[in-house]
Structure formats: structure tokens, C-alpha cells
């Protein structure tokens, strides 16, 4: 039986913040199984994560991480750090390497002493700290093309949001397993903020208006 899978997720570091973005389509073979799939989760006050791959495996990981983050806070009175959270997940995945979780994970967070942090993890527990950006899922090759061409480490949060959405939009236009809207989170020293549909629509609307203006200018020049 086919499992629900297929997605595009993006994570990037910008001016003192981490931005995570995902699409909302879950596919089962060639069938679109869910048009409102949740792939972006808040783990703690300063940590969020994205999932790609087998939905059941990914959701089990999300539940485990949320529980561990709460236990850590109960025992220590502090929030777990993004690095500790990523390392914990790496250990969980590696311990199950003979029967791996079929998923790719991005963990983004804000360390109050060390700034924004971004990590990517593979199904066997391999963990990479990303200094710029990362992407996972079936649409990631397309998203990477946009990120490689336009990313700037010093970009503002608004610019970072627009780039993440542009990378997702490009992937959704070419990858049949990605689509049906987006979810976005911004993580700063103030904590995790999940953007509303209205805020996302506004950002996408601004990009569309700029694109129309550019195309109009090109037409005028060609005339």
C-alpha cells in the first residue's frame, strides 16, 4: 500500500531569524490524498520543525519531540535549545536505523545565547547544521535553484519570507507532489510565530504585483 508522501519544505536563516515554509499537499501514489496536510509544527516556544516523507513516521517523531521538550522544561525550568532538540532527534533516528523512519526533517529555532539555528536530518539520524538554507522533499531540487540564485545572509525577515515563498511557489508549479497552499513560521528571539493565511496571501499578493510591474516595463522597452 502506498504511504502518504511528497512535499516541498524550505528553511532559511535571515536577519536574526529563521524562516520555515512548507506546502500543504499529501500524495498517495498518483492520488492527492490531502489538500490541507500539516507539515509545519511548533515544538517549543523557540523551536519549530517541518516534515517530508511518510506522514505516519513523521507524526510519530513530532509527538515524541513535543513530549521530550515539555519534559525538559518541567525538569529544568528552561526551554530546550535548538541544537539539543536536533541532537535528541538524531539519536532517536539513529537508534531506529535498522527500521528507519522514512522522513526528512528540518528543525529551526532561536537560541537566546547563540542566535538563529537551522538543522536538517536524514532518516538514519545524520544531522547537518545549515548556515544559510536547506530544503527537503520531492520539490527540493526546484526550490534549491531559487534559493541558490537569490539568497543573501543579510536579507531582512520580509525579504526572507518572500524568498521562501518564491522557492515554494516554483516547486509547486513543477513538482506534481507539491501544492495546495503554504504554511509559514518565523522564529525570532520573541519566539515562534505561525503566519495566518491572510498574512501569507498578502505577501504573495505583493510579489504578484511586483512581477506584473516588471513584465509591463519589459513590454514597454521592447516596443
Swiss-Prot record:
Residues 1-6 form a propeptide. InterPro entries: Ntn_hydrolases_N, Pept_T1A_Psome_bsu_arc, Pept_T1A_subB, Proteasome_bsu_CS, Proteasome_sua/b, Proteasome_suB-type. One of its GO terms (biological process) is proteasomal protein catabolic process. The active site is at residue 7. The formation of the proteasomal ATPase PAN-20S proteasome complex, via the docking of the C-termini of PAN into the intersubunit pockets in the alpha-rings, triggers opening of the gate for substrate entry. Interconversion between the open-gate and close-gate conformations leads to a dynamic regulation of the 20S proteasome proteolysis activity. Pfam families: Proteasome. One of its GO terms (molecular function) is threonine-type endopeptidase activity. It catalyses: Cleavage of peptide bonds with very broad specificity. Keywords: Autocatalytic cleavage, Cytoplasm, Hydrolase, Protease, Proteasome, Threonine protease, Zymogen. PANTHER family: ATP-DEPENDENT PROTEASE SUBUNIT HSLV, METALLOPROTEASE TLDD. Component of the proteasome core, a large protease complex with broad specificity involved in protein degradation. Belongs to the peptidase T1B family. This is Proteasome subunit beta. The lineage of its organism: Archaea, Methanobacteriati, Methanobacteriota, Methanomada group, Methanococci.
Amino acid at each position: 500500500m502506498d504511504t502518504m508522501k511528497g512535499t516541498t519544505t524550505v528553511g532559511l536563516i535571515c536577519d536574526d531569524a529563521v524562516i520555515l515554509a512548507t506546502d500543504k499537499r499529501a500524495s498517495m501514489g498518483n492520488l492527492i490524498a490531502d489538500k490541507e496536510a500539516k507539515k509545519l509544527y511548533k515544538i517549543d516556544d523557540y523551536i519549530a520543525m517541518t516534515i517530508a516523507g511518510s506522514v505516519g513516521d513523521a507524526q510519530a517523531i513530532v509527538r515524541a519531540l513535543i513530549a521530550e521538550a515539555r519534559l525538559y522544561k518541567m525538569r529544568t525550568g528552561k526551554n530546550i535549545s535548538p541544537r539539543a532538540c536536533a541532537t535528541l532527534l538524531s539519536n532517536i533516528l539513529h537508534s531506529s536505523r535498522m527500521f528507519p523512519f522514512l522522513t526528512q526533517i528540518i528543525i529551526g529555532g532561536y537560541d537566546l545565547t547563540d542566535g538563529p539555528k537551522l538543522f536538517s536530518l536524514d532518516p538514519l539520524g545524520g544531522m547537518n547544521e545549515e548556515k544559510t538554507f536547506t530544503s527537503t522533499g520531492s520539490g527540493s531540487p526546484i526550490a534549491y535553484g531559487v534559493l541558490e540564485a537569490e539568497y543573501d545572509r543579510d536579507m531582512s525577515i520580509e525579504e526572507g519570507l518572500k524568498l521562501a515563498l518564491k522557492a515554494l511557489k516554483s516547486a509547486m508549479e513543477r513538482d506534481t507532489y507539491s501544492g495546495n497552499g503554504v504554511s509559514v513560521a518565523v522564529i525570532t528571539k520573541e519566539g515562534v510565530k505561525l503566519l495566518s493565511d491572510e498574512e501569507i496571501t498578502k505577501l504573495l499578493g505583493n510579489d504578484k504585483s511586483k512581477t506584473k510591474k516588471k513584465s509591463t516595463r519589459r513590454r514597454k522597452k521592447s516596443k
